[in-house]
């Protein structure tokens, strides 16, 4: 291919590009409708531009804001139920979901440990006793489905 040299080639620019910017264009308007639209355009050009606020966020900030909006919407849909009249000193903290339902004693045998590894996953095992039904780990299918739908939209927006 040929190498292009700027001094060999001269570009011819159209007249509107070479004309100074201070000149006003004369618009020939044939109909009244065109006159009105031309007047609107001139009026819009002479007005001061509207102020706009532009927010720039990084990805982490956008995810935080999106999750905050989803959580806020959920709170408005289902307001928190008031706890029953129980003394604050008698409230028990529920164990975290990642904690195993089986507790091992210091003298447990290896057979017990093997049987624990063969048991189904925490979320798939049926709830045991009245305490398990109030546990945050055991959720109704509707709650899980709603949360999954909300997170689906977040994933779709940010990771596609």
From Swiss-Prot:
GO terms, molecular function: damaged DNA binding; molecular adaptor activity
Residue ranges of the region described as Disordered: 78-152
Protein name: Cell cycle regulator of non-homologous end joining
Motif XLM, chain ranges: 150-160
InterPro entries attached to this UniProt entry: MRI
GO cellular component term, pick one: cytoplasm
Main function: Cell-cycle-specific regulator of classical non-homologous end joining (NHEJ) of DNA double-strand break (DSB) repair, which can act both as an activator or inhibitor of NHEJ, depending on the cell cycle phase. Acts as a regulator of DNA repair pathway choice by specifically inhibiting classical NHEJ during the S and G2 phases, thereby promoting error-free repair by homologous recombination during cell cycle phases when sister chromatids are present.
UniProt key word ATP-binding: no
Motif segment (KBM): 1-21
Superkingdom of the organism of origin: Eukaryota
Gene Ontology BP terms: DNA damage response; double-strand break repair via nonhomologous end joining; immunoglobulin V(D)J recombination; negative regulation of double-strand break repair via nonhomologous end joining; positive regulation of double-strand break repair via nonhomologous end joining; protein homooligomerization; protein localization to site of double-strand break
In-chain residues carrying the UniProt-annotated modification N-acetylmethionine: 1
Compartments where found: Cytoplasm; Nucleus; Chromosome
Subunit structure of this chain's protein: Interacts (via KBM motif) with XRCC5/Ku80 and XRCC6/Ku70 heterodimer. Interacts (via XLF motif) with TRIM28/KAP1, ATM, MRE11, NBN and RAD50. Interacts with splicing factor SF3B1. Interacts with ERCC6L2; this interaction is DNA independent.
Compositional bias segments (type: Low complexity): 99-109
Domain notes: The KBM (Ku-binding motif) mediates interaction with XRCC5/Ku80 and XRCC6/Ku70 and recruitment to DNA damage sites. The XLM (XLF-like motif) mediates interaction with DNA damage response proteins TRIM28/KAP1, ATM and members of the MRN complex (MRE11, NBN and RAD50).
Keywords linked to the UniProt accession: Acetylation, Chromosome, Cytoplasm, DNA damage, DNA repair, Nucleus
């Amino acid at each position: 291919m040929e190498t292009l040299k700027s001094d060999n080639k001269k570009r011819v620019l159209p007249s509107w590009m070479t004309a100074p910017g201070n000149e006003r264009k004369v618009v020939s308007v044939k109909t009244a409708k065109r006159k009105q639209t031309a007047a609107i355009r001139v009026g819009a050009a002479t007005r001061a531009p509207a102020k706009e606020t532009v927010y720039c966020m990084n990805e982490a900030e956008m995810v935080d804001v999106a999750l905050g909006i989803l959580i806020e919407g959920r709170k408005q849909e289902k307001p928190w139920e008031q706890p029953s009249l129980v003394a604050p000193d008698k409230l028990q903290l529920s164990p975290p979901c990642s904690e195993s339902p089986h507790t091992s004693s210091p003298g447990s045998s290896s057979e017990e440990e093997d049987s624990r590894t063969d048991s189904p996953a925490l979320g798939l095992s049926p709830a045991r006793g009245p305490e398990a039904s109030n546990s945050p780990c055991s959720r109704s299918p509707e709650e899980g489905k709603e949360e999954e739908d909300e997170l689906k939209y977040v994933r779709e927006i940010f990771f596609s």
